[in-house]
Amino acid sequence: MANLRSFKFFDFESTEQVSNILLNPANGEAITIEVSGADGVSLVVQGRTDLEETNWFTIGVVSLLDYGISSKITKSGLYMAPIAGVTKIRMVSETPVGGFKVFAISVD
């Protein structure tokens, strides 16, 4: 497990935008994501399977609160997403809501 507590996808962003890109260290199979202050926001996890690939694909997430599966994160909490075979991961904010943070906690 790689501890990525310092990797920030978003930190109090206030407009729609694309996050920083996380390279998949050691070809991890799952990423744990912490989202705070994001009630009412719409976030999408995206990935690429090849470093040369230009298309981004949506990755579904599992809420670690109720184990619900979704293509979007719409509230604060802990989430896990499968990333086996994915080389780059990013988040896209589809809603201009300020004051939220999104961190990658770990890659297993």
Give the location of each predicted region.
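Activation corresponds to long, low-complexity, non-globular regions
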Residues: 1-2
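Beta-sandwich interaction modules
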Residues: 7-27, 59-108
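Short proline/glycine-enriched turn/loop motifs at strand-loop junctions of beta-rich domains
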Residues: 28, 37-42, 96-97
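Aromatic/hydrophobic beta-strand junction motif of beta-rich domains
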Residues: 33-35, 91
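Generic structural signal for short, flexible, solvent-exposed coil/loop and linker residues
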Residues: 34, 48, 78-80
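Short, surface-exposed beta-strand/strand-loop-strand elements in extracellular ectodomains
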Residues: 40-58, 102-105
